[in-house]
Amino acid sequence: MDKRLDKKYTKEWFILLGLLLGVTVTNGFARFAYGLLLPAMQAEMDWNYAQAGWLSTVNALGYIVGAISTMFLVQKFASEKLFAFGLITTSVVLLMTGVLPTLEAQYALRFFAGTFGAVSFSTAGAIASGLFKENARLNALSIAILFGTGGGFGIILAGAFIPTLIDVVGNSAWPICWIIIGLLSIVFMPFGIWSALQIESSKPSRLTRNEFRLLKMLPELAGYACFGFGYIVYLTFLSAWMTGQSIDATMITTIWVILGLCICISPFLWRPIFARFGNGIPLAMVLSSIAFGSVVPLLSPAFSILILSAVIFGSSVFMAPGAITNFTRKNLPQEMWAYSISIFTVLFAISQTLGPYVAGLIGDYFDNIGMGLVTAFIILLLGALVSLSQKELSKN
């Protein structure tokens, strides 16, 4: 009988499904649904650009706080417990986002969404790395599915109903959208918690300076920081461009669903690469693909070009977390996985905070938002080149 079909593997696939739904909440909903709802929130609540911009900033700051906290928490608590805690708290925060509409409450909720989401997202990869230990190909596929399909599924769900509901009801529907997202999160939450409880409890990380070879991982770390800087510029541009072009709800839904679908199928495209390489090549290839997907819109403002861009970008963007998780699993002992991924997440959180700001300054200087995309393109390619120099490490 095919090992994929025996009882042991069947249970592991269900565990992966639960983890995937957790990532749908903490990544797909908590981070990317906000981009769809911000224009309606800003118009209905009469926020200026500075107020709306600070909502993104406090969310990014919360993500930094959560990522840094996870670095220390994984040395005291098992990854499974931290994942469940982050999933529960993020689900509650998303529901409350639709209940408390004041600007002050939104600042606090966006901060906590970033903080709790980072805790759960950072530990999800470490948990998934322990699945299918006897089968390198299935292990690589499970890591890719976790980040790709998990985040992509959230984008598909949010993109399928938010633009249409806003178009039919009006901007005043934004709290309803958040409540729907919150309720979906609460529905998904038990599956994620169940999956975490099925995993054999991992030992908290116990590290010394000599055990964690940070300097030998610098190319991979630098490449991932470049990913954080570059990818967020594109997503910021995508929302702004479609809003500025007065694209109707059907076309906006089409773009987001295509983007989400490509993210969902991306694990199957990248699985052979993850299974084959334990060095910096997977991250370098992912960053190169994201870079070219980001710059495609500059070729033409045509809607078809934007679709092409979404396909290229969506097929690779969520594979960067998968690439660094795959690198961690293949190069470090299991007790170091969560700590390693949390360090990657801290760098990512900081760089994604700086990305839109720097790109915005460049766009303002040239009076052309396209120059921000060019900047992201250059940074992503630079990250790809640096990642290529990353060699495999010895686990011993």
For each feature predicted by the language model, list its residue ranges.
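Cytoplasmic helix-loop-helix junction between adjacent transmembrane helices
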Residues: L109-T149
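C-terminal transmembrane helical hairpin of 12-TM major facilitator-type secondary transporters
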Residues: G278-F327
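A late C-terminal transmembrane helix in Major Facilitator Superfamily
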Residues: R329-N368, A376
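Paired small-residue
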Residues: V93, E104-A113, S304-I312
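Helix-loop-helix hairpin linking two adjacent transmembrane segments in secondary transporters
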Residues: T102-A105, L138-A196
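Extracytoplasmic gate region of multi-pass secondary transporters
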Residues: Y34-G35, K216-V257, I263-C264
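Helix-to-loop junctions at the C-terminal end of transmembrane segments
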Residues: G66-A78, S266-G278, G363-D364
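Conserved MFS/SLC helix-loop-helix module at the cytosolic interface between two early adjacent transmembrane helices
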Residues: V65-T102
